[in-house]
Amino acid sequence: DKLFHYYGSDKADIFRSTKEKGHGFSKFYSNKLNHLRDKYINILEIGSYSGASAAAFKKYFKNSKIYCFDINISNFKYSSKDLNVFGLDISDKKKLNKTLKEIGVKQEYFDLVIDDGSHNLSDMIFSLKYLFKYLTKKGIYIIEDFKHPNYYQYNRNIDHILIDELIGNLKDKKFFESNILDKNDQDYFFDNITKIETFKGNLKDSDILFIEKN
């Protein structure tokens, strides 16, 4: 938690700039990811904003290379040869494809994908559909604040089942109606997900999801 707090990330128990409660995700990250701490890993973070979390991750995972995608990179304030920052809207599939190609990313490349982006329902589902395949075997896909569409109508921007119901169906290997995830997508998830866990942080909307690939 000290690293998230030091760099000013809202993942910390206390948000440094306001002294108010943060999401309190540190303990979940530590418990789930400590085994990767000294390994050479690639991390994709969606929604990096100022780069506070990315800087903390780089300090914690000293052998990591981190790729940061954000719609507005003008606020990003950290630099490192292992921090790679790209300005793009994650829902723009054409630009996403182009960016991944430019940086030489192939499927099964990222050890961690962390979605802390818009929290819009459509973006979370699209990112999961598209980027889960870029996880390495045993990789972990993380969605922060995944229940925002449950709490805030503006994040529920499409007519679709919510993430908590979606992951319930994935756990049960039960097909569901979706205009984003077709049968082939769902089959892929059924075959490639080994564990799904959710945790509650400090605040009403502090919900975090870990999906492990087999």
Task: Tell me what each language-model feature is.
Residues 1-114, 118-143, 147-214:
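A short alpha-helical cap/connector motif
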